[in-house]
C-alpha cells in the first residue's frame, strides 16, 4: 500500500516514501484520540512538499486516511496529524427535524439509512454506497454524533460500518460483521492468552427491600444460578450462598424493585476476563467483528468484539495491532 499526500481537492502531490513513522488509530470510541493519525518526517522532507492544514494523507482502497489539522515542528522532526475518516464522522451531530423529538429511521435498507443520517453534512468528499446491503434497520437519534449513531444502528442488526477511500471519495457502507467465536482463538491456534476469574466479590443471592416499614415492607429475593440464570425459586443455603441486601425504599412498584434487584445481581456476578493477543494471528479483523478465546489450561472462554485497530508503518515495516472488548 502507498501512503498518498494530496491537496484539499484530493489532487495527489506525492507518494510518501521518506518518513520516520506513520501511526493511525481506528476504533469504536467517539473521542478524538480514538480515531486519529500522526506522521513523522524530517524537516527537509516536509520543506520539499509541505503538508499543511486541509491536506489529506491516505491509502487508496483502505480505511486508513484523514485530514491534516495539526503541524508541529520539534527539533529536526515535523509531526502532522488529524482525524481519520472515521474521526471526521464523530464531529457531526444528528439533530431531529424541526418540531420532532428524534431523527427516526424506520425499516430502511441499511445503506439508505446511513445516507439519510449523513445527508449533506460531510460535503462531496464522503459518499454512501448505493448497493443493496440486504439488511433492514431502524433507529431513533437525538443530538447524537454521527459515528455513534451509525454504529449503534448497525450493531443491533449484526452489522458494521465499512469505510473505504476509493481514490476520489470516502465511501461508507453497511456490511455484516463476522463472528469468529466458532473458531476459538485458543493456544492451539497459537493465540497467546491470559485468563482470570474472580469470585471473591461476587454474590449469588440478593434480598431487596422496597416500600413500607418492618413487617409491611416489600421484600424480593432473587438467586443467580451457576449458568447465569436469575430465579425467584429458593435455592439451598450453605457455604456457596453469598447474600447481600439492596435497600431501595423509593421503588415505586414491585416490578421496579425486582428489576433493580436483577441488575444488581448481574453486576455482582463473578468477573471473568481473558486477554487475547490478536497481533500474531493472520486474520484481517474488522472493527465490530467478534472473536472468541479459550484458555485450554483453565477452560475459561469468552467472546469480544474488535474495538480498535492501530496501524503502524516505520523502518521495520507495516503492522496492525488489535484490541478487543475495551
Model-derived features with residue positions:
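Short beta-strand-centered interaction patches in the first periplasmic/extracellular domains
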Residues: 72-79, 84-89, 127-203, 207
Amino acid at each position: 500500500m502507498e501512503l498518498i499526500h494530496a491537496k484539499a481537492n484530493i489532487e495527489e502531490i506525492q507518494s510518501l516514501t521518506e518518513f520516520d513513522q506513520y501511526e493511525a488509530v481506528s476504533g469504536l470510541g467517539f473521542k478524538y484520540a480514538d480515531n486519529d493519525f500522526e506522521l513523522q518526517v524530517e524537516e527537509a522532507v516536509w520543506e520539499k512538499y509541505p503538508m499543511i492544514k486541509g491536506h489529506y494523507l491516505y491509502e487508496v482502497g483502505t480505511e486508513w486516511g484523514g485530514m491534516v489539522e495539526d503541524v508541529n515542528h520539534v527539533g529536526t522532526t515535523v509531526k502532522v496529524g488529524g482525524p481519520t475518516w472515521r474521526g471526521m464522522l464523530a464531529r457531526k451531530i444528528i439533530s431531529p427535524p424541526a418540531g420532532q423529538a428524534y431523527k427516526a429511521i424506520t425499516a430502511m435498507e441499511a445503506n439508505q439509512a446511513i445516507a439519510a443520517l449523513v445527508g449533506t453534512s460531510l460535503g462531496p468528499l464522503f459518499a454512501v454506497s448505493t448497493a443493496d446491503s440486504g439488511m433492514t434497520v431502524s433507529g431513533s437519534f437525538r443530538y447524537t454524533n454521527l459515528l455513534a449513531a451509525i454504529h449503534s444502528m448497525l450493531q443491533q442488526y449484526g452489522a458494521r460500518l465499512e469505510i473505504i477511500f476509493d481514490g476520489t471519495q470516502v465511501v461508507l457502507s453497511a456490511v455484516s460483521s463476522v463472528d469468529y467465536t466458532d473458531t476459538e482463538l485458543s493456544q492451539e491456534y497459537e493465540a497467546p492468552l491470559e485468563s482470570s476469574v474472580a469470585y471473591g466479590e461476587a454474590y449469588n443471592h440478593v434480598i431487596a427491600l422496597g416500600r413500607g416499614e418492618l413487617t409491611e415492607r416489600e421484600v424480593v429475593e432473587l438467586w443467580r444460578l451457576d449458568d447465569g440464570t436469575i430465579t425467584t425459586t429458593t435455592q439451598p443455603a450453605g457455604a456457596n450462598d453469598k447474600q447481600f441486601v439492596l435497600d431501595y425504599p423509593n421503588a415505586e412498584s414491585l416490578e421496579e424493585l425486582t428489576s433493580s434487584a436483577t441488575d444488581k445481581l448481574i453486576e455482582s456476578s463473578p468477573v471473568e476476563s481473558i486477554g487475547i493477543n490478536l497481533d500474531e494471528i493472520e486474520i484481517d479483523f474488522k472493527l465490530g467483528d467478534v472473536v472468541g478465546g479459550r484458555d485450554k489450561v483453565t477452560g475459561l472462554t469468552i467472546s469480544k468484539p474488535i474495538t480498535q485497530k492501530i496501524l503502524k508503518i516505520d523502518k521495520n515495516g507495516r503492522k496492525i495491532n488489535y484490541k478487543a472488548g475495551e
